[in-house]
């Protein structure tokens, strides 16, 4: 099975889609090749919509098997598509690009260090997870500096031992460093993964793919 793809030639596939368990949210302009790759690689149902009229779904949506946290600027029509499959929480802060500022699985969420504590608590209660404020190697947009499933977490290669230890404590699963698309530490921009499988941007090297497989347990 092919493990790399593009979004209309762009290897930053994580910017244009959000995978949450058995669903993937993608924009209407997603090419058929991209749709097929996600279906086959991740075994997900596709929810097709823009968010606040934009195709950058990965930056504007975060979530897990219980719910989706979405930019507060999403329209009622867009939210209706999501609500058929998940409960939805609107992030109405200045920092409303949910996919950029939240990394989550079914156990934990790591959020931007400047996200207000009360909002972080609300996200935790909504997703049913423990929440920590975190940077990863100096990067504050945790949703792009890391990717989590229920089996593993991959983070920016500059993440410190202390940051990794905090993630291991809150998640209880393996945490490893890696890159995507020939050296990008912003792994969330080029990686879509769930407990079933993964897809990476087509600029990703064989070594980088091997690291993804190792961290998420696909080599077992």
From Swiss-Prot:
PANTHER family: TRANSLATION INITIATION FACTOR 6
InterPro entries: eIF6
Similarity comment: family membership: Belongs to the eIF-6 family.
GO biological process annotation, one example: cytosolic ribosome assembly
The UniProt record lists the keyword Protein biosynthesis: yes
Protein task: Binds to the 50S ribosomal subunit and prevents its association with the 30S ribosomal subunit to form the 70S initiation complex.
GO molecular function per UniProt: ribosome binding; translation initiation factor activity
UniProt keyword Metal-binding, yes or no: no
Disulfide bonds: none
Coiled coil: none
Gene label: eif6
SUPFAM superfamilies tied to this protein: Pentein
Official protein name in the record: Translation initiation factor 6
Signal sequence residues: none
Stored HAMAP family: eIF_6 (MF_00032)
Record keywords: Initiation factor, Protein biosynthesis
